[in-house]
């Protein structure tokens, strides 16, 4: 099975572009060190595929966060990705989730938040109600409301050789182009026939040929997708310095050290009294980076 990659492609005879992504290794890394219920694992896979596809639509350096939150047993699920296709994600539960639970059963009364943060420029946030039955349907509504670009997402998750796998495709009318709705619907119907097993096991070019062998398609150089966490000891130290001396001293007196745990990658950062003394000395100048 090939490593995780995103492939962009363009239909020469239609004002429509597409993306195909596989995120198997990244998906498995996100699930490592977490004992999520099966339905939550599936949901995170869908969100990971969707975030990768959305991030690839960015025309600038920056990142996208796709977040689900509500009052159901799934309190929060979030995937963060950037223009380099570096992904991470986590979920937080506040109740039991049965196998096969639907999106609405997990989230309850909630919403989907898409946050776009350019490296240079203003942050943008869009909020979408959970009107669709799936993450893909909710995001299609987001595109229709925010960008008014006909967009379809085709997301597949499952198991292959005992491991969780996820992949998907995106079709979108090119901005400032007048694509015939019938043309877009025709391509969407072709894309909807893609089988999960094809996405999980076949090279991207073969999948695209099977779907569009009667169309003229240009496929661009692929981009690697990988799990990447941005936590660090210095970031944890900076966070500690936002606490009062009394709070820090009480934590050290109680446990002998402070254990800061990254929910995304599972790394533990330990700080004892000597570490705190050194951090306080450093923080008297500039914050750590």
Curated annotation (Swiss-Prot):
Belongs to the HSP33 family. The gene is hslO. Under oxidizing conditions two disulfide bonds are formed involving the reactive cysteines. Under reducing conditions zinc is bound to the reactive cysteines and the protein is inactive. It comes from Pectobacterium atrosepticum (strain SCRI 1043 / ATCC BAA-672). HAMAP family: HslO (MF_00117). Keywords: Chaperone, Cytoplasm, Disulfide bond, Redox-active center, Zinc. This is 33 kDa chaperonin. It comes from the Bacteria. Disulfide bonds join 229-231, 262-265. GO terms for cellular component: cytoplasm.
């Amino acid at each position: 099975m090939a490593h995780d990659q995103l492939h962009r492609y363009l239909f020469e005879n239609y004002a429509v572009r597409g993306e195909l992504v596989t995120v198997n290794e990244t998906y498995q890394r996100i699930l490592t060190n977490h004992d999520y219920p099966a339905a939550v694992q599936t949901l995170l896979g869908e969100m990971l595929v969707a975030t990768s596809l959305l991030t690839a639509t960015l025309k600038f350096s920056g990142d996208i966060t796709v977040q689900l939150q509500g009052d159901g047993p799934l309190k929060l699920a979030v995937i963060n990705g950037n223009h380099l296709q570096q992904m991470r994600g986590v979920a937080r539960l506040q109740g039991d989730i049965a196998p096969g639970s639907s999106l609405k059963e997990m989230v309850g009364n909630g919403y989907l938040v898409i946050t776009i943060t350019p490296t240079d420029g203003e942050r943008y946030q869009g909020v979408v109600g959970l009107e669709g039955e799936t993450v893909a349907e909710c995001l299609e509504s987001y595109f229709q409301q925010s960008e008014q670009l006909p967009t379809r997402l085709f997301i597949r998750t499952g198991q292959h050789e005992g491991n969780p796998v996820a992949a998907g495709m995106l079709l979108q009318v090119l901005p400032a182009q007048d694509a015939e709705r019938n043309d877009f619907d025709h391509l969407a119907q072709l894309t909807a026939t893609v089988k999960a097993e094809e996405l999980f096991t076949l090279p991207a070019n073969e999948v695209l040929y099977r779907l569009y062998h009667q169309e003229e398609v240009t496929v661009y150089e692929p981009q690697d997708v990988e799990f990447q966490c941005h936590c660090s000891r210095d970031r944890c130290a900076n966070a500690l310095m936002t606490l009062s001396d009394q709070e820090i001293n009480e934590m050290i007196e109680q446990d002998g050290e402070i254990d800061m745990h990254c929910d995304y990658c599972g790394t533990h950062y330990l700080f004892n009294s000597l570490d705190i003394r050194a951090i306080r000395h450093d923080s008297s100048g500039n914050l750590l980076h």
